[in-house]
Each structure stands twice: as C-alpha cells, then as structure tokens.
C-alpha cells in the first residue's frame, strides 16, 4: 500500500476535558502535584479547546475505526478520538479507580490519574476471577449522546464475534462462556476449506459457494503464495518447501506446490483472508481473489447448537457490569483498555436488547460496523473532521 503523506484535522470535542482517557490503550489523564501542570484535575463537560490538531504521518491506511485500525498511524487517530474503558499510568500499570482518581509517583513527581471507570478485581474460591466495572455516569460522546454500559457491552461483543478479524485479541482471553459462544459459529471460508475441494456435503454452504472459493484459491491464492516463493528463491531458496520454511512455514512436503503453501497459510490464520494479508510478498490478497469470496472469511455460519451470549458478561445496571474469567489471566486487565465505541453509531440500536441476547448487530455479521471504518466517532479529546492528501 502506498504510504503517501496524509493529513487529519481534528476539532476539539466539547464532550470531555483532558482529565478523561484519550483512547484505547492510552495512559489515563492526569494532573501533577505541581502548579505548573497544564492538565486539568477535574472532569467536566466543557470544551477542552477550540483549536485544531493536524496530524501529518506517512503510515495512514484510512482505517480509523476503534475496531479495525491496524497501522500505528491509524491507531494514533483512535487514541485521540476514543474513550478507553480503563487506562494506565506512566509506568504502564493499570488505573483501577479512575472515577475518583489515583495518585502515583513517577520520577519524583506525584501524578493523579483519572479515567472513565472503576474496576474491582476479585479472585473467587472456585478459581474464577470477577471484574466489577463501574462506569462514570456523566460521560458523553462527541455528538452529545450519553455513554452507558450498553456501549461497553456492544463493543465487547464486536471484539468477541466469531467473524471479528481486527487486531484486538480479547477473544483469546478465558472469559466464561466465550469458547462456547465462538465455537457455535464458524466462518464460511473456514468451513469450505476444511471440507476440502472434493466435498459433496452442502449442509453449511452451497455448491456454488464451494466452487467460487476453490476457483479463488487455485487462481489468486496460488499467485499470492507464488510471489512469496519467487522472493525466497531470489534469496537462496531452492523449491517451494524451502521457500515456505524460510518464510516461517515448516513441514511442507519436498514436492509441495504453491497451492500447498497457500493452504498452509490459510490454516495458520484460520482462513481469515484479512489476517493472511500479513504474509504478502507484494500483492494484497484482496486484489487477487474476488470480493465476494474475500467476504467469506467474515461471513458467520451457525454450526451445532447456537449459543446466544457470553455467560461471563453480565450487565448489572445502566453504568455497571461484571466480567468473569474461568481463571486468573495476566492479560485480561490490559484487554480492558478497549475503546468504548458508541452503539448508536457503530451498531444498530434496534438490534440491541440485552435481556434477549441481542447486542447491536446480528451475530456473525459485522458489516454495519465495518461500514463506519473511515470516519470515527467517539468520546475522546478530539473529534474527527477530515482526511485528505492536503493540509486542512
């Protein structure tokens, strides 16, 4: 992808002051103990500034979504425009009392950190761990809509959806019921690939879909793998097997073909075409296979008994919830730095009914969420204004 110089103009949001978390994975906002600090120590709903921040970076891909931002430059935009559920201090340690704030020392100076929520972590006698989350009740998104726990739950379910293929890995945590929720659905691409090219059972997909998939593999998929082989052979590899091994895919047969190599890549990435793009030696996979087939990897298909919710995610109030893991996880608390994305913008409010296991979209269909990839909306310090090649 071309790395052309792009510009982002971000107008300051009136929703929150800088004492609130700036975005996913960012440090909690703070105020120093010294009078020279420029950070505010109290949260308010007044405008932070009437200025405009212009970002000029070379790595923008235009995926300014809290769910699908991939490049570091795109993530910079997310950090500025989104609220994080939890934040961290200057040492990277989590802030669990963000509502009232926590004071911590760093290099001889005391800093008080504020955030969007409090989190109490309890290790239970049965080995499970419960995270009691209490959200502030005075937060607003940049369009003036209130931030509630429903926005948090919606965001979690997007990250945990079986067809989610973004960079956030919350789906790998031991949340109670998550494995059952995800395993009750598979992607169309994975089902067809695992069935094999000679399959005759069309219970979960049509014969036409199967043919389209394997036609794409035999054409664009082979070309994708062959580009890697050509690159590796120009750098010392002698055949497909040695090229694949040099690329990190050991174990292919001595007489392996480019198709065998592509199948190994697909298996490695659970047949997520967007994830497989990481192995490109030149062309994007999306340029080599038909758009409708590419979408197979984000098309959910129910398999077995459908599981409608994640048992470990429980709403307890308009601004509170609990999340329970089956065991102590060193990464779970860091996953809670997730962005709180507005349900009313990224989801479908008519499809949100917590009591009836509906969470703002149809399970296995994130098309509505994906459609809002280029223009972010959140509750961070800035609102997104414009993205173009020139200076705004």
Model-derived features: positions:
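Bacterial Sec-dependent N-terminal signal peptides
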Residues: 1-11
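Hydrophobic core
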Residues: 16-20
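Bacterial lipoprotein signal-peptidase II cleavage site
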Residues: 21-34
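N-terminal low-complexity, Pro/Thr/Ser-rich intrinsically disordered segments
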Residues: 34-55
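Short, well-ordered beta-strand elements
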Residues: 49-59, 129-134, 152-155, 320-323, ...
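N-terminal lobe/hinge region of extracytoplasmic solute-binding protein
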Residues: 56-126, 377
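Gly/Pro-rich hinge or "lid" segments in bacterial periplasmic/extracellular proteins
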Residues: 90-93, 274, 278-310, 318, ...
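Aromatic- and charge-enriched surface segment that lines or borders ligand/interaction sites
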Residues: 117-282, 322
